[in-house]
Swiss-Prot record:
GO terms under biological process: DNA recombination
Protein name: Putative inactive recombination-promoting nuclease-like protein YjiQ
Pfam families on file: Transposase_31
Chain's role: This pseudogene is the C-terminal fragment of low activity DNA endonuclease RpnD which probably yields 3'-hydroxyl ends. The intact protein can be seen in this entry (AC B7NGZ6). Expression of the repaired protein increases the frequency of recA-independent recombination, but also decreases viability probably via DNA damage; in a RecA strain expression has no effect on viability but does induce the SOS repair response. May play a role in horizontal gene transfer.
Annotated GO MF terms: double-stranded DNA endonuclease activity
InterPro entries, A to Z: Rpn/YhgA-like_nuclease (IPR051699), RpnA (IPR010106), Transposase_31 (IPR006842)
Similarity comment text for this entry: Belongs to the Rpn/YhgA-like nuclease family.
UniProt source species: Escherichia coli (strain K12)
């Protein structure tokens, strides 16, 4: 099943994903059958919350382009409490909100979520902190790479950072294309 949550709503094209191929007939032969494309932008929230395990994802995908997700807190709390989302799902949810939503209000969002779910406060804060730390580490690595690329002395960098020879070697490797400009907003 494919989910659409683009900015145009409702989805303006065919809901059969095979029709999106340049040659739909060949696509049908290759993939045997079409699986449905669900336009979550037109599904009512009341219906989405009935979708159990995928409800969290669908609800966030539908509303992520709103710059203020605080209005969804009530529904998210109900889903998180009743569906017993695991750490992996909560991590994916928080990552998605942080990367796609309004980063400026992420901390406020986390604070309100934990205020309403005190029994899960430690778990949510641990996950949010881990996401924050991962971003911090990637930022440090990006700065160190830029220093190296712009002629900074590798021995000096190693001395002040305490990095091992292996870690320094990893910094000299080019970033994968998808990560090179990930900090730029489109």
């Amino acid at each position: 099943m494919l989910f659409y949550h683009g900015s145009r709503s409702p989805y303006p094209w065919s809901l059969c994903w095979l029709d999106e191929f340049a040659d739909p007939t060949t696509a049908r032969k290759l993939y045997n059958a079409a699986f449905p494309l669900v336009d979550v932008t037109v599904v009512p929230d009341d219906e989405i919350v009935q979708h159990r395990r995928v409800a969290l994802l669908e609800l966030i995908q539908k509303h992520i382009r709103q710059r203020d997700l605080m209005g969804l807190i009530d529904q998210l709390v109900v889903l998180l409490v009743t569906e017993c989302a695991n750490d992996s799902q909560i991590t994916a949810l928080l990552n998605y909100i942080l990367l796609t939503g309004d980063e400026a209000r992420f901390n406020e969002f986390i604070s309100e979520l934990t205020r309403r779910m005190p029994q899960h406060r430690e778990r949510i804060m641990t996950i949010a902190e881990r996401i924050h730390n991962d971003g911090y580490i990637k930022g440090e690595q990006r700065i160190l790479r830029l220093l190296l690329q712009n002629g900074a002395d590798p021995e000096w960098i190693q001395k002040i950072t305490g990095l091992s020879a292996e870690q320094m070697q990893a910094l000299r490797q080019p970033l994968p294309e998808r990560e090179r400009y990930s900090w730029l907003k489109s």
